[in-house]
Amino acid sequence: MPAPTQLFFPLVRNCELSRIYGTACYCHHKHLCCSPPYIPQNRLRYTPHPAYATFCRPRENWWQYTQGRRYASTPQKFYLTPPQVNSILKANEYSFKVPEFDGKNVSSILGFDSNQLPANAPIEDRRSAATCLQTRGMLLGVFDGHAGCACSQAVSERLFYYIAVSLLPHETLLEIENAVESGRALLPILQWHKHPNDYFSKEASKLYFNSLRTYWQELIDLNTGESADIDVKEALINAFKRLDNDISLEAQVGDPNSFLNYLVLRVAFSGATACVAHVDGVDLHVANTGDSRAMLGVQEEDGSWSAVTLSNDHNAQNERELERLKLEHPKNEAKSVVKQDRLLGLLMPFRAFGDVKFKWSIDLQKRVIESGPDQLNDNEYTKFIPPNYHTPPYLTAEPEVTYHRLRPQDKFLVLATDGLWETMHRQDVVRIVGEYLTGMHHQQPIAVGGYKVTLGQMHGLLTERRAKMSSVFEDQNAATHLIRHAVGNNEFGAVDHERLSKMLSLPEELARMYRDDITIIVVQFNSHVVGAYQNQEQ
């Protein structure tokens, strides 16, 4: 759980960094800060408003300034040993294998690997995985927080329950409600698959349960009791939208408990994107809000790997998103609703949970802030109204849902936050995972592209290949192996231990200038079961 200053006072920390290093920091709190000149602006979630220019103003001679000073926190010739590197990379890895019955796995999923590599302190990414116990299928998701980790934490805990409830038939919802009324034990809805370090908020569990119960009560009232097939796409959309609505409502109503009152406000004023997969037999649905991605790994007949994108980024690079925003607001806002590729010139993702500063009316924002705790009322960011803020809401948590029917050649699915996709091309991601899972990486010829390679350099590449092969065997987790490549790859696509060591040795105030938090889930499909489904249909 982050300290209050980590959510509501990011500018203070950023300004200190800018004074120390002579330039504005590259802060993946993704808040009102700007980047050093050498970092692309399109990698920031937030850009500065002129009112904050004095907080984040880079020096004109920033590079000479940094070269003229040395700090103890800057690594010079210190390198982590391979065991130390492995210890860092494997600290958050988790693997789950679907259990067999009578010696057989009847699920379309063999299992999954997940891992996280933080750059923020604390990490703002979250991950979740659970088996639906009252319906069929498994849920897996990654959540990328900004302006702190409060919103991503809440969404990672709550969203799967909202999805599971949305998928339940009317009679099961009635059974659960009757159990609550009579004080009987509830039917378990989800079986979680979590790393021991993954956090659950015990303090907010009652608040979260009451909101969820209100949701299923409304579903009971809306349903006439007639048996009908549940539309998974509609259930996913309803769950996303309802959770975001509850996050907003809880912040508006507040709580008598001062801790919970502050918590719900932190959740609402921070934000999070989400990319969730629901796998039921050969039916794969991906619900995406924001700029995390889902990528399908397909093995072609010749053994090569192809990447099939199952999600779309909701940002300025998506023409349909730009058109949607313009249609949702008056024509006189066409030039202001998206400026410098950001929502109102500030926010990079066009869809997200929380971020009520882009959803609430100005009057509502002022009322909540004035009646809220002092930490909220005294903060400059929370009181700041985005420019050209005329017709809210400008932001939505409604997901875009993609459906794919699994085939035997569909071998795995990669869910990852943008920290991975900023460093690696989707085709490289699929190839590396595919080669890892099949053990075929060492059979491929070395590709040097257009480089002129000397005999000595070729010897170095062969040495690196041997090291790369050994890293495959030491990585028992596909997500860990992918992170190793994302952070340590050189220009030839091989893991460079020196580079990997340098990147992992960076102090936290510098790490954010070079990379984002990375969270990955690799889901491996059971080709035999998928093929059996296909044969039954034929």
From Swiss-Prot:
The top of its lineage is:
Eukaryota, Metazoa, Chordata, Craniata, Vertebrata
Q: Which InterPro entries match?
A: PP2C (IPR015655), PP2C_BS (IPR000222), PPM-type-like_dom_sf (IPR036457), PPM-type_phosphatase-like_dom (IPR001932)
Keyword Transport assigned to the entry: answer is: no
**Species of origin:** Rattus norvegicus
Task: Give the residues the record marks as binding Mg(2+) 1.
Answer: 144-145
GO BP field: signal transduction
Q: How is its activity regulated?
A: Magnesium-dependent and calcium-stimulated. PDP1 activity strongly depends on its Ca(2+)-dependent binding to the lipoyl domain of E2 subunit of component of the pyruvate dehydrogenase complex.
* Family statement drawn from the similarity comment of this UniProt entry: Belongs to the PP2C family.
Instruction: Kindly provide the name given to this protein in its UniProt entry.
Output: [Pyruvate dehydrogenase [acetyl-transferring]]-phosphatase 1, mitochondrial
Q: Which reaction does it catalyse?
A: O-phospho-L-seryl-[pyruvate dehydrogenase E1 alpha subunit] + H2O = L-seryl-[pyruvate dehydrogenase E1 alpha subunit] + phosphate
**Residue numbers binding Mg(2+) 2:** 144, 418, 516
Q: Which GO terms describe its molecular function?
A: [pyruvate dehydrogenase (acetyl-transferring)]-phosphatase activity; calcium ion binding; magnesium ion binding; protein serine/threonine phosphatase activity; protein-containing complex binding
Q: In which tissues is it expressed?
A: Highly expressed in skeletal muscle.
According to the entry, every stretch annotated as the PPM-type phosphatase domain falls at 109-525
Q: Which UniProt keywords apply?
A: Acetylation, Calcium, Hydrolase, Magnesium, Metal-binding, Mitochondrion, Protein phosphatase, Transit peptide
List the Pfam families hit by this protein, alphabetically.
Answer: PP2C
Its primary localisation, in coarse terms, equals mitochondrion
Localization per record: Mitochondrion
> What's the cofactor?
Mn(2+); Mg(2+)
* Source domain of life: Eukaryota
Q: What is its EC number?
A: 3.1.3.43
Which parts of the sequence carry N6-acetyllysine?
Answer: 202
**Is Acetylation one of the keywords UniProt gives this record?**
yes
Please name the gene that encodes this protein. Pdp1
